[in-house]
């Protein structure tokens, strides 16, 4: 959409007016006891709700004092390490089993898991001509926008879209979990064809394949993938499924659910939250940062040169001048992120299989150096370690997943957590979420038009 000269001048002028009138003195937040970002100075979130779905632990009580500990993550009370080890020992894919656990609170037996997989397969169908009429029309490079548009449009095909009974919401959630990968991959293919002039191919999912296998199958021209590729992607999905009720997109799920809104609107809102670069787009920043590092460091095996680049990042002298080392640190974890710890072993296997050992060694070096550099350069209130985003972008690049699908892959996993939290919010809370905002604007006398 083009803009007139008048429009451009107006926007430039009035944007400055907006900046002047929107700014609030930073000291007022501290003076009035406002928890910015709903977190205290140590990064601990304000207690806004209770949940049975997952638990994150980054500290423990020793001799009456709270001290940092290795990060722990529990899904429905089960340690994530044990869950991953459990399905890996059986040589099984974990997405469907852990989805069942998060939604229903119990680990399924063989009969229950078989039935659940059949239900997900039955739900893996889009309305007639939906791909052509909705997904492929007006293709966008931003696949998250494509997903949001598609999900809101799906509501038009649902005669009970606004019914928020448990049975209906569960049906809707299972359907959206099943079709979200299709909409994302088809959306990318549409963009790649109509914008990049590449070949267009639409592969239907195979009901006998796992979610990870189907994602790779639908994405690739020849539908081929190795077992290792599918298993590493499956692990990535499991590790990204759920992370408490306070992360931005899941809290959005609670907020919009509390208003009584329908499932399609709730998931669209969560997607809009996840789309933000401060939330779901972090792994893209890691990949871009690593590309910049390779351009600006002569010897990638030299720790001194790599450390110098990391310090430049913190001094806002490199990459995007934001002063951040992407993939390092987390709002909750300090000593370690268990998801990153689990993921690293699988990343290493894939890197060696793909001939990317040197790249893996570089990532490992940065994982070791960055916390030390940050501790030297910054005043920090807790430890810093690599988070799961640090390695996920590297994995997706090894799987030949395009950059446009990095955040949608996150969404394919996290929609499970959103669904579980929506069901929990509907069950337990009957009040709309409404935190307080205090006005710091002085009262003014009205000015007549001719006196302005």
Give the positions of each predicted feature.
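Non-transmembrane, aqueous-exposed alpha-helical and coiled segments at domain scale
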Residues: 1-452
